[in-house]
Every structure is written in structure tokens, then in C-alpha cells.
């Protein structure tokens, strides 16, 4: 659950209680709103004593003196004005949100002397607040004393010259926050509460936003020949599902764009079982499906002028007596056969049938799949970049640019025939692993065999979707990575 900020925008604010948050660049002599919030002029003295200079994300937190119109004043540094980016405004909003405690009212003054703050910057600041406010504590019956406990509802007035423009831009920010926080919720849910059926039901809830949602059952997938996906699912008593989400915001004649997510709701590794230490984190092995669901939420909420498909393959990988074995050969929906070398390389088996189904049914402009697919990508890139693999240079370049814009960064990895041959099998058309070397690359090549000539990109988000370092806009174990990135891609290039 999240702390609720009721955010509004105004050209001015009449202060009579609560908290005032003032912004200051490194160059400015005074903070925005200082005359209004601090008629006694104590900020300058406090800043001198604390050696506060307006360094980026540094904060000066003081109790307001008697006679001031507020109880607390926080001055937040922005750093050098010339170096401010959209992501810096996002971070500033998150940093500001972290200071809103024990109050039900706050005013934020954005217009720093000598700095032009446009409507987009104000909306980005507000988005940062909403992303930072997220927490997942619905299963806690008691809160620790040191945990942040903002009021259930805080009225926040953001003071900026272009208040009307900021209000208009903020509607998209609310949509983005809703999608990111939905993805975070899904990743954070315990696996006993979120199986394939329950996840599919969460996707079905998007119908209230105008998304068309179909849920394919095991029987329907078997009829379609999805032997790869069903092979993963057969070791669990929880039945698999394939959720197909359609947002029809574009022209009827326009081909859709498509996003496919790996949704392994819990991954034991199957018969090739994982070590016990850290296995609890495998509840997050559906981070790709969570991101796709969150993206569809955003597109529908902001009424994006595009036709978009979201498909998520939902299974649980368990090691019971009916589980698939190393050495099994399964037949995918494409008709290609796969030798299962390692049952812990299951995500690609789920995705290959979902990719083929998407391409065969919808004939999309492109397909982008997201998956917490390999530990190898974490070794290569850590949790700073997600791995990007693509058969299309234009799509890759657009994704990379969207990643830089949103700070959900991607790093393009190589593909090539020398890697592809590593997944050739003696007994089937291919095998599901290529050995220890180049593990993330051979996994991508496996997927590439199921996309034909359609422009395609694979995002390996194993290092960024869960357990990534906390920062100004994310304090959650499940980060919601990919939602903002893909929304920016759609917004920049694919809306009518």
C-alpha cells in the first residue's frame, strides 16, 4: 500500500500550518518561497551554520521559529541549474516526499530564483513524490518505530508559475505512477497469495480501464500446442494461465505493438532445483509479466493513442512427481522441438510459446519481451542496466534512448551465429541452455528462434526488477522496472 498524497498545483499558497518545502540551486542566493515561509529570515542563518549550499538532493530541515506560518521548513538542494535533467526533478520529488512526516499538509515551492520551471518539470516532481510514497506493508500487523509513517492522506500544494499546465501534465504522471506501483505490488506479493490464477485475475481488473482481457486456460493452451509453456507448469498443482490484454486506443487500421512478459510466479528450479538460500526471492520471477501489466495500466489510464497488446505467460515451476525432467523433449506451439537440459531454464520455455502466439495471432509492428531470465545478465551488468538483445537496430536505438530518458537504462548485448549454434541439440531442434558461457546471450538466441522476421527486442531485467538498490524514487524490493521505459518508448514513437 502507499501513502496517499492529494497533489494540487497553484500559483501561490497561503500558509497556515504544516510543512513548507523550498528548493534551492547551488547558484541561487535564496530558496524558492523563502519570503513566504520564512518571514523571520532564519533559513539563511541555519544554512550558514549547517554549511548547506544547495548540493543536489542535500536537505536542510529546521523547526520553524515562533510566528512562522508553518511548523517545519525543509530546503532541498537541486545542484547546478545548468545540469538539471528530467530525472533530477523526479529525484527531487522523491526526496521531498521522504521529508513529509507527521503532517497532513505540505506546500512545495518550485520556482527557484533564476531557474525556469516548466509544467513538465512540475509534473515530474509530482511523479517522483508518488513513486517514493509507495510501500508494501499490507501483511504487517505492527510497524517498527523507525519506519516512515506519513499520514494516511497528505494534502500537497505545489506552487509554480504554470500551475494550469502542470495540472494537465500531471494527469499522465498519475497514470505512470499507477502502473509502476501496480507492477511493484505484483512483484512484492507473496507466492502463496499470487499464483497464476490470481495473477490473471489482477490482469482482468484492467477491464475497468477499457482494456480487453482474455484468459486462456490450460485446456485452451494445450489445444493451441503450447507444449513448452505447459511443460514448465506440469510440476505444479496450480494451473497455468495466459493473459492476453488489448488496448485499442489507435486507429482500427493500425497494426498493434506488442509486449510479452515472463510470469513464473514462483521458481524453485523444478527438478534442477535451486539452492535454498535466497529462493524466497524467486517470487519475483514474474517481474516481466508485472511490468507488462503495469504498462497496459498506464496506456489505458492516459488513453494512449495506440493499439497495444500485452501477453503474460503465468506458471509455477515446481518439482513434484509430474514435473518435467532434464532430457525431456517438448514440442512448442511453433512446431519446433526443444530438449530440456535444465528445468531451471524455464522462463524461455514460457516465453517462446507466448511470442509465437502473439506473432501468429496479432501480426504486430514489433514485439518486446521482458523477463527476469538469467543470472548471467546480473553478473555482466549488475543492477545498473538491463540487458537489451534485438534483431532490429531502430527498435534497439529507440529503447536505449527511452532508457536514458527515464533512467531505466539498457545495455545492448551481442547476438551472432557463433552464439546461436551453442543451443543446437543432437536429439531435438534445439536445447534450452547453451552451457555456462554467454548464458544471457544464448537465452536470447533461444527466444530469437520464435520471432521470425518481426522486429523484436528482449529485455533481461533479472538485475533491475527486484532487489535493486533503493534510491530517491524507489524504496521497494520490487522496483517496477520497465513500465516508465516502455511508456516513454510508446509516447515518443508510436502514438497516432
Swiss-Prot record:
SUPFAM superfamilies: Macro domain-like, Zn-dependent exopeptidases. Its cofactor is Mn(2+). InterPro entries: Leucine_aapep/pepB (IPR011356), Macro_dom-like (IPR043472), Peptidase_M17_C (IPR000819), Peptidase_M17_leu_NH2_pept (IPR023042), Peptidase_M17_N (IPR008283). It catalyses: Release of an N-terminal amino acid, Xaa-|-Yaa-, in which Xaa is preferably Leu, but may be other amino acids including Pro although not Arg or Lys, and Yaa may be Pro. Amino acid amides and methyl esters are also readily hydrolyzed, but rates on arylamides are exceedingly low; Release of an N-terminal amino acid, preferentially leucine, but not glutamic or aspartic acids. GO terms for biological process: proteolysis. Mn(2+) 1 binds at residues 267, 344, 346. Its main location: cytoplasm. GO terms for cellular component: cytoplasm. It is found in: Cytoplasm. Binds 2 manganese ions per subunit. GO terms for molecular function: manganese ion binding; metalloaminopeptidase activity. Its EC number is 3.4.11.1, 3.4.11.10. It holds the Pfam family Peptidase_M17. The active site is at 274, 348. Keywords: Aminopeptidase, Cytoplasm, Hydrolase, Manganese, Metal-binding, Protease. Mn(2+) 2 binds at residues 262, 267, 285, 346. The keyword Manganese applies. Belongs to the peptidase M17 family. Presumably involved in the processing and regular turnover of intracellular proteins. Catalyzes the removal of unsubstituted N-terminal amino acids from various peptides. This is Probable cytosol aminopeptidase.
